[in-house]
Amino acid sequence: MPTIQQLIRTERQRLTRKTKSPALRSCPERRGVCTRVYTSTPKKPNSALRKVARVRLTSGFEVTAYIPGIGHNLQEHSVVLLRGGRVKDLPGVRYHIIRGTLDTAGVKDRRQARSKYGAKAPKS
């Protein structure tokens, strides 16, 4: 516990919050260009081939982003929109690609949770 005299001399340091998505630079989304599209394997108890892309952002960062949904049309030089949000079983993946925007197509034949995958309403 500091004395009052010590507090007068130097005030208490404010706690600084560390952002979970620094590459977005306090923006909700960021545009970027895919430099590499590949698959990655998840951490220990899980097993799959998760689709990820290496993206160079307009903020100058190069990050790894997850491609959600079944099937995608991304390739090198595709322009994508990124949002924050990590993938728990892929270390180092802290961003998601937004489906249905820019060069990213929405998920085909998606009926539930369509807005999250950029899918249009089905023709009834």
From Swiss-Prot:
GO cellular component: small ribosomal subunit
Residue list for modification 3-methylthioaspartic acid: D89
GO molecular function: rRNA binding; structural constituent of ribosome; tRNA binding
Keyword tags: Methylation, Ribonucleoprotein, Ribosomal protein, RNA-binding, rRNA-binding, tRNA-binding
The UniProt record lists the keyword Ribosomal protein: yes
InterPro entries per UniProt: NA-bd_OB-fold, Ribosomal_uS12, Ribosomal_uS12_bac
Pfam families noted in UniProt: Ribosom_S12_S23 (PF00164)
Source species, domain of life: Bacteria
Gene Ontology biological process: translation
Subunit structure comment from the entry: Part of the 30S ribosomal subunit. Contacts proteins S8 and S17. May interact with IF1 in the 30S initiation complex.
Family note: Belongs to the universal ribosomal protein uS12 family.
Summary of the function given for this chain in its UniProt record: With S4 and S5 plays an important role in translational accuracy. Interacts with and stabilizes bases of the 16S rRNA that are involved in tRNA selection in the A site and with the mRNA backbone. Located at the interface of the 30S and 50S subunits, it traverses the body of the 30S subunit contacting proteins on the other side and probably holding the rRNA structure together. The combined cluster of proteins S8, S12 and S17 appears to hold together the shoulder and platform of the 30S subunit.
Name assigned to this protein: Small ribosomal subunit protein uS12
Taxonomic placement: Bacteria, Bacillati, Cyanobacteriota, Cyanophyceae, Synechococcales
